[in-house]
């Protein structure tokens, strides 16, 4: 894999990268589309979204892995769902696999190896180190190494590190472990990195973002290559049912150094009383706000060129809340995707105007704007003592 810096903005961390992997070429910033066996997934519905990279996210726990090792029916079911997800990717799209594994007491070490054998389809170009959780760090390292070793035998497959939301000292150890794997395995990358924001976003989890930015700046110098940052499980915020409009903190990602925006694959279990009050939010890329659906209808949002999913279509579905929620999500994904080339064009044509473009997004709150400025300062401002 080759990662090339095309252009970067002035005063912000927004940039344009070209990522080449074999015959695949992906330009950033980019919104990755999620694919699954569900026909209504992001990659399965025809929209105006610029394509380029598809992510397949698969969740396991130790029990399901153990069953998969001994139950042929369960193996066949997973194979079918996995194959169905892959078919939704187009020929010119890069496919990234992102496993998540909850480790419990009945965990078998070999199950991670068997999982890699089953999931490594020839169409998969890139696999993320699994998001391991519910286990002490030594156990996580042990399973990471087992998984990487098993994947290292696959032809034409690249393995990318995943930064998980751990404690600072644990994150330091995790990066060192990845550097060891990079030195040992030729198909282990360090110029492409996944970051699990775990139902949050780079603004709300600035501590995690800052750690990644600080470390990738050093690593980039060591490997003599830019490092593409692919954020997964990004969500615009929590408890947003209380407001009629909330800032699009997920859409801020490209301005703070996240090159590829992934979907949120971690649904939050909600109490019934919350579900009853939950309001459908619609993205307006003109002001970077998520608006309540009824407000969006009255606001008459100017939709970006290339939109295939429109507010008029959503209005026709408003009587069916379940279906309206499904299509509202697709609507938002399409609008996020269409915004990425607009950001890219401004960066390439006039890097000094990116700041002005972002300043014009009126739904962003002061804290979000401060974080965007702070991210740039934290990466590029070097403070030294004057002697």
Regions inferred by a protein language model and the residue ranges of each:
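Non-catalytic, usually N-terminal nucleic-acid engagement modules in DNA/RNA processing proteins
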Residues: 1-156, 321-387
């Amino acid at each position: 894999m080759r990662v090339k810096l095309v252009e970067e903005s002035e005063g912000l961390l927004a940039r344009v990268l070209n990522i080449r992997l074999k015959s695949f070429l992906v330009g950033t910033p980019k919104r990755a589309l999620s694919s699954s066996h569900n026909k209504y997934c992001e990659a399965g519905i025809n929209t105006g979204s610029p394509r380029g990279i598809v992510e397949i996210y698969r969740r396991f726990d130790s029990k399901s892995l153990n069953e998969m090792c001994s139950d042929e029916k369960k193996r066949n079911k997973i194979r079918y769902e996995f194959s169905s997800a892959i078919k939704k990717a187009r020929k010119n799209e890069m496919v990234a696999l992102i496993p998540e594994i909850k480790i419990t007491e009945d965990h078998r070490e070999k199950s991670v190896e068997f999982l890699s054998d089953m999931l490594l389809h020839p169409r998969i170009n890139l696999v993320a180190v699994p998001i391991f959780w519910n286990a002490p760090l030594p156990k996580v390292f042990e399973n990471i190494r087992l998984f990487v070793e098993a994947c290292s035998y696959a032809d034409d497959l690249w393995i990318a590190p995943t930064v998980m939301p751990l404690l600072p000292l644990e994150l330091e150890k995790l990066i060192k472990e990845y550097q060891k794997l990079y030195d040992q395995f030729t198909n282990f990358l360090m110029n492409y990195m996944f970051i699990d924001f775990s139902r949050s976003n780079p603004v709300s989890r600035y501590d995690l973002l800052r750690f990644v930015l600080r470390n990738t700046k050093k690593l980039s110098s060591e490997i003599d290559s830019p490092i593409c940052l692919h954020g997964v499980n990004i969500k615009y915020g929590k408890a947003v049912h209380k407001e009629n409009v909330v800032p699009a903190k997920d859409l801020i990602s490209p301005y703070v150094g996240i090159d590829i925006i992934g979907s949120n694959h971690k649904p939050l279990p909600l109490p019934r009383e919350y579900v009853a009050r939950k309001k459908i939010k619609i993205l307006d890329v003109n002001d970077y706000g998520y608006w309540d659906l009824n407000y969006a209808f009255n606001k008459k949002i100017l939709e970006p060129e290339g939109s295939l999913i429109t507010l008029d279509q959503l209005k026709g579905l408003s009587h069916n809340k379940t279906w309206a929620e499904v299509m509202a999500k697709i609507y938002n994904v399409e609008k996020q995707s269409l915004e990425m080339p607009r950001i890219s064009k401004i960066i390439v044509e006039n890097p000094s105007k990116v700041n002005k473009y972002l300043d014009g997004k009126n739904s962003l709150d002061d804290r979000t704007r401060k974080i965007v400025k702070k991210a740039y300062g934290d990466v590029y401002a070097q403070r030294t003592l004057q002697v």
